[in-house]
Design a protein with these regions (language model features):
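Hydrophobic membrane-insertion alpha-helices, especially the h-region
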Residues: 7-27
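Terminal, low-structured helical/coil segments at or just beyond the last alpha-helical repeat
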Residues: 214-291
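Short coil/linker segments at helix-helix boundaries
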Residues: 27-159, 164-191, 200-204, 208, ...
Length: 291
């Protein structure tokens, strides 16, 4: 028997096996689709670029009810795109992955981080790009990251992890910031079951917003009542806020109340004064000078 005939027979056998497996999985596929319909989770068939060979091949699996399998295969290629620093391809893959499995919160988070951190960092280090080109491309990837998170929340509005991720995106000082939205997102995440510790991050972002000092002061005093919230930054910010708001002497905290001793207060306040977290520092220099 010639080698060509053997090769043809092997292909025929492979197709036959695929057909048998597909036929065997048909009852399970129909059952799962019915469950998805009953739960209101059945999604439309994803659209793929006709020039994208891998996505086209995996489209058959997704149409057969194997969306998770297809998404995992695309995750492998997204990782390969990361290794090759091929960020347009990585963005395309994550868009396809999140379309296939919009209820998988981890996919949305990974997609956003890949764009906001990895892609933006690569653009910043690319010496072939001009300053203007770097700014434009970085902004495009940040837009993509934000879009992934917002679409993830739209598909999973009750998931606290996505709200936390968007809050962290909004407060990242290395990129563009939106402290007002970060406050709301941390608040929403806690309402949805995230750790109450994130109320402190709500407070930190409130302190960065001009005109909301009174709100920050009230929240800070409330948090200070609990030992677990008494971080050095919170103690320092309480001193700053009472200076900015001209809080009456009888309602103020003293450095000894907040830090235990004057020496500890000086140490913490010096460190706070020289941090780069864009917190207000009203009155700190004067207090240290008086010491």
């Amino acid at each position: 028997m010639s080698g060509r005939v053997v090769s043809v027979l092997r292909y025929l056998l492979a197709f036959a096996l695929v057909g048998v497996v597909g036929w065997g999985l048909q009852p399970l596929r129909l059952h799962l689709q019915q469950k998805e319909r009953n739960a209101g989770l059945l999604l439309p068939a994803p659209e793929f670029d006709k020039t994208d060979a891998l996505a086209q091949q995996l489209a058959w699996f997704s149409l057969g009810g194997l969306r998770t399998f297809a998404a995992e295969m695309l995750c492998v290629d997204a990782t390969n795109a990361w290794l090759l620093q091929d960020w347009p391809r990585a963005h395309r893959r994550w868009s396809q992955i999140t379309t296939l499995c919009p209820r998988r919160v981890n996919y949305w988070i990974r997609a956003a981080r890949d764009m906001a951190k990895n892609a933006v960092a690569w653009v910043g280090n690319d010496e072939t790009l001009s300053t203007h080109e770097k700014a434009v491309r970085s902004n495009d990837y940040l837009d993509a990251a934000e879009a992934f998170l917002q679409e993830g929340i739209a598909n999973n509005p009750g998931n606290a992890l996505l709200w936390l991720e968007l809050a962290a995106f909004d407060e990242d000082l290395a990129r563009r910031t939106n402290f007002t939205r970060a406050v709301e997102n941390y608040r929403k995440a806690v309402e949805l079951g995230a750790s109450p510790m994130y109320r402190r991050w709500e407070f930190y972002n409130l302190c960065r917003i001009r005109g909301r000092e009174q709100e920050a002061w009230q929240l800070g005093r409330e948090l200070y009542r609990e030992e677990r919230h008494r971080a050095p930054s919170l103690r320092c910010l309480l001193l700053v806020l009472q200076n900015k708001l001209n809080i009456p002497e009888e309602s103020r905290f003293t450095p000894e109340q907040l830090f235990g001793t004057r020496e500890r207060a000086r140490k913490q306040l010096r460190a706070f004064l020289h941090n780069d977290l864009r917190f207000p520092t009203t009155g700190i220099r004067e207090l240290l000078h008086d010491e």
